[in-house]
UniProtKB/Swiss-Prot annotation:
Pathological association: Deafness, autosomal dominant, 9: A form of non-syndromic hearing loss characterized by onset in the fourth or fifth decade of life and initially involves the high frequencies. Hearing loss is progressive and usually complete by the sixth decade. In addition to cochlear involvement, DFNA9 patients also exhibit a spectrum of vestibular dysfunctions. Penetrance of the vestibular symptoms is often incomplete, and some patients are minimally affected, whereas others suffer from severe balance disturbances and episodes of vertigo. Deafness, autosomal recessive, 110: A form of non-syndromic, sensorineural deafness characterized by prelingual hearing loss. Sensorineural deafness results from damage to the neural receptors of the inner ear, the nerve pathways to the brain, or the area of the brain that receives sound information. DFNB110 affected individuals additionally exhibit mild, age-dependent vestibular dysfunction.
Species assigned in the record: Homo sapiens
Gene Ontology cellular component terms for the protein in this record: collagen-containing extracellular matrix; extracellular region
Stated name of the protein: Cochlin
All copies of domain VWFA, residue ranges: 165-346, 367-537
Organ and tissue specificity: Expressed in inner ear structures; the cochlea and the vestibule.
Effect seen on changing V66G: In DFNA9; affects protein deposition to the extracellular matrix
PROSITE patterns xrefs: LCCL (PS50820), VWFA (PS50234)
Length: 550
C-alpha cells in the first residue's frame, strides 16, 4: 500500500498515512552513509541507520516533509527532526514525484527549492520508535526546531561508484537563445544532482561555447552538488556563433590540468551539448580530445530539418566527434522541454567507468616493440612459437592511430625492422603482419639489435605521450655486450622485459631487464613454455604503466 495524503479538517495540518509493517519487520536497519540519497533506496519502505557527525552544511536536501529523491536521507531526517546529528534509525517511505518542493530552514539545515522531480520520499523515526502500529498517521506539522545544531568541517565524499572528472560544455550561442539556454542549465543541474558529486565521487566543471569559449568554473572549484547548482545558476548567456569545435579543443587542452583539479587515474569526460549543429569543424577537435585521453559525449538537441541541412558543414558531426562511434557516447533529445526522463540514462552512461574507452590505460596508451631472435639456433618451427608469443601479447592491447602502437624487429648479426609503430593502426593488420614474418637465420648480436631498435624504432616517436616498452625474446647468448645498450634504452625511458628460452644466459637476461629484475626477466627451458609467460608480461606492462601515472 502506498502512502497517501489526507486532510485533517480544522487542524491546519495534513496527515500522511503510511503503510503498515511488512513481513521483513524484524530485519536490522541498513547502515547508510551521510550522503546516501532517497533514489539509492529501491524499496517502498526501508529501515536505515544514519551515522553520527554528518556535516550539516554539505547536506543536499530539497523540500520539506516530502523530499525530492535526490536529497540525502540523513539530511532529510535531521531537517525534519526525526534524528539529531548524532545519527540513529530512520524509516524511509518512497513516494511519487511532484512539483514545487519548498525551501525551509529547520534544525540547522536550509533545504532548497526544486520545481519538479520524478520521485520523492519522506522519513519517520526508525523501527525502535513507538510509531510502529499499522496505518499510524504521522503529523506533518513542523517539529520544534530548538537549538541550531553545530556544523562540522567534514567534507562530503560523494558517490564512490561514479569516479569521473566531467566538463559540461554547454551551448551559449545565438542559435540556442536565452530561453533554451536557461532550460539547458536546468537540465545540466539535474544531471549534476544525480551524479553524487563529492570529494571521492565525480567532480564537475562547466565551459560555455560561444564566439570564444569560456571556462565558467573548474573541477577544483566545487565539490558539493549544492555549490555546483548555484554556480550553474549564475552562468550568464554569452551569445555569438556556436563554435563548438573551438570550445571542445580548448576544453581538452586547457581544462583537464592538474592545477585545475584533474585527478590521476580518473576518467576525463566532456559532455558536449549542441542545439542544432556546430558552426565550425568539430571532427578535428574530437581527434585532439581523444589524443588527450578525454571521453567525448555529444548530447544533440533538435536535429536540423531538411531545409536546414544545407547549412550544416557535416551531417555526421556527432559520429566524428564522440570518443567511439558505437552509440554509447551519443545522446539525443528532441527538445529542451520535458527532459527529466533523460537525466538518469545520461548519468548511468557517465558513471560506467569500464566503457570510457578514450581514457588512458595500459591497454591504449603504450608503445610496445618486440625484438625477436632470428638466429640459426632457434629453427623455423620454434620461430613460429616465438611469433605466436608475440601475437598473444599484441592482441591484448587496443591498437589504433590514437591508442596502443606495436612494432617488431628481427635480429641475427643484422637487424630488420619488420614494421614500425606508424605502419599499422589496426589490430587485425598488426597480427596479420606478425604471422607473416619470415625467419632470417644467422648469428646473435643482441646488443647491436637493442641499439638499432632504440634509434630506428623508438627514435621517430620520441614525442609520443604513450609509455614505451621493449620485449626481447632470445634463445641464446649474445656475441656482443648487452648491458651498455640496455642501460642506454633505460635512460631513454624505455622499459625492457627480457624473455629467454633454452640456452639464453640468465645473466644476459638480467642485464637487459629493467628494475626490479625479478619482475622483468623471464626464462623457460622449452619454446612451448612461452605461452604462460604471456600473462606475466602483460601484467608487468600494466603495473609499470600504472606506476608511471602516480
Amino acid at each position: 500500500m502506498s502512502a497517501a495524503w489526507i486532510p485533517a479538517l480544522g487542524l491546519g495540518v495534513c496527515l500522511l498515512l503510511l503503510p503498515g509493517p511488512a513481513g521483513s519487520e524484524g530485519a536490522a536497519p541498513i547502515a547508510i552513509t551521510c550522503f546516501t540519497r532517497g533514489l539509492d533506496i529501491r524499496k517502498e519502505k526501508a529501515d536505515v541507520l544514519c551515522p553520527g557527525g554528518c556535516p550539516l552544511e554539505e547536506f543536499s536536501v530539497y523540500g520539506n516533509i516530502v523530499y525530492a529523491s535526490v536529497s540525502s536521507i540523513c539530511g532529510a531526517a535531521v531537517h525534519r527532526g526525526v534524528i539529531s546529528n548524532s545519527g540513529g534509525p530512520v524509516r524511509v517511505y518512497s513516494l511519487p514525484g511532484r512539483e514545487n518542493y519548498s525551501s525551509v530552514d529547520a534544525n540547522g539545515i536550509q533545504s532548497q527549492m526544486l520545481s519538479r522531480w520524478s520521485a520523492s520520499f519522506t522519513v519517520t523515526k526508525g523501527k525502535s520508535s513507538t510509531q510502529e502500529a499499522t496505518g499510524q498517521a504521522v503529523s506533518t506539522a513542523h517539529p520544534p526546531t530548538g537549538k541550531r545544531l553545530k556544523k562540522t568541517p567534514e567534507k562530503k565524499t560523494g558517490n564512490k561508484d561514479c569516479k569521473a572528472d566531467i566538463a559540461f560544455l554547454i551551448d551559449g550561442s545565438f542559435n540556442i537563445g536565452q530561453r533554451r539556454f536557461n532550460l539547458q542549465k536546468n537540465f545540466v543541474g539535474k544531471v549534476a544532482l544525480m551524479l553524487g558529486i563529492g570529494t571521492e565521487g565525480p567532480h564537475v566543471g562547466l565551459v560555455q561555447a560561444s564566439e570564444h569559449p569560456k571556462i565558467e568554473f573548474y573541477l577544483k572549484n566545487f565539490t558539493s552538488a549544492k555549490d555546483v547548482l548555484f554556480a550553474i545558476k549564475e552562468v550568464g548567456f554569452r551569445g555569438g556563433n556556436s563554435n563548438t569545435g573551438k570550445a571542445l579543443k580548448h576544453t581538452a587542452q586547457k581544462f583537464f590540468t592538474v592545477d585545475a583539479g584533474v585527478r590521476k587515474g580518473i576518467p576525463k569526460v566532456v559532455v558536449v551539448f549542441i542545439d542544432g549543429w556546430p558552426s565550425d569543424d568539430i571532427e578535428e577537435a574530437g581527434i585532439v580530445a581523444r589524443e588527450f585521453g578525454v571521453n567525448v559525449f555529444i548530447v544533440s538537441v533538435a536535429k536540423p530539418i531538411p531545409e536546414e541541412l544545407g547549412m550544416v558543414q557535416d551531417v555526421t558531426f556527432v559520429d566524428k566527434a564522440v570518443c567511439r562511434n558505437n552509440g554509447f557516447f551519443s545522446y539525443h533529445m528532441p527538445n529542451w522541454f520535458g527532459t527529466t526522463k533523460y537525466v538518469k540514462p545520461l548519468v548511468q552512461k557517465l558513471c560506467t567507468h569500464e566503457q570510457m574507452m578514450c581514457s588512458k590505460t595500459c591497454y591504449n596508451s603504450v608503445n610496445i616493440a618486440f625484438l625477436i631472435d632470428g638466429s640459426s639456433s632457434v629453427g623455423d618451427s620454434n620461430f613460429r612459437l616465438m611469433l605466436e608469443f608475440v601475437s598473444n601479447i599484441a592482441k591484448t592491447f587496443e591498437i589504433s592511430d590514437i591508442g596502443a602502437k606495436i612494432a617488431a624487429v628481427q635480429f641475427t648479426y643484422d637487424q630488420r625492422t619488420e614494421f614500425s609503430f606508424t605502419d599499422y593502426s589496426t589490430k587485425e593488420n598488426v597480427l596479420a603482419v606478425i604471422r607473416n614474418i619470415r625467419y632470417m637465420s644467422g648469428g646473435t648480436a643482441t646488443g647491436d639489435a637493442i641499439s638499432f631498435t632504440v634509434r630506428n624504432v623508438f627514435g621517430p616517436i620520441r614525442e609520443s605521450p604513450n609509455k614505451n616498452f621493449l620485449v626481447i625474446v632470445t634463445d641464446g647468448q649474445s656475441y656482443d655486450d648487452v648491458q651498455g645498450p640496455a642501460a642506454a634504452a633505460h635512460d631513454a625511458g624505455i622499459t625492457i622485459f627480457s624473455v629467454g628460452v633454452a640456452w639464453a644466459p640468465l645473466d644476459d637476461l638480467k642485464d637487459m631487464a629493467s628494475k626490479p629484475k625479478e619482475s622483468h626477466a623471464f626464462f623457460t627451458r622449452e619454446f612451448t613454455g612461452l605461452e604462460p609467460i604471456v600473462s606475466d608480461v602483460i601484467r608487468g606492462i600494466c603495473r609499470d604503466f600504472l606506476e608511471s601515472q602516480q
